């Protein structure tokens, strides 16, 4: 369930807008999406894990806020990110 350093590095490289970019909304949303997918799988196996479910809800909320920010500031970057990640917004 933890994010391996190598996986994190690959996600950052793939979604970075320039070299050394780790804080752009695209990178943050991509990392959150990976964590959300892993936590969703965990919760399918462990449906009574209420504490992890709360963490999942917080991550989804944070991702939604970042996506709303990106949609406001740069709609074209928002659309490409949604398509690349396969999110249904």
UniProtKB/Swiss-Prot annotation:
It comes from the Bacteria. The keyword Amino-acid biosynthesis does not apply. GO terms for cellular component: cytosolic small ribosomal subunit. InterPro entries: Ribosomal_uS15 (IPR000589), Ribosomal_uS15_bac-type (IPR005290), uS15_NS1_RNA-bd_sf (IPR009068). PROSITE patterns: RIBOSOMAL_S15. SMART domains: Ribosomal_S15 (SM01387). One of its GO terms (biological process) is translation. Keywords: Ribonucleoprotein, Ribosomal protein, RNA-binding, rRNA-binding. GO terms for molecular function: rRNA binding; structural constituent of ribosome. HAMAP family: Ribosomal_uS15_B (MF_01343_B). One of the primary rRNA binding proteins, it binds directly to 16S rRNA where it helps nucleate assembly of the platform of the 30S subunit by binding and bridging several RNA helices of the 16S rRNA. This is Small ribosomal subunit protein uS15.
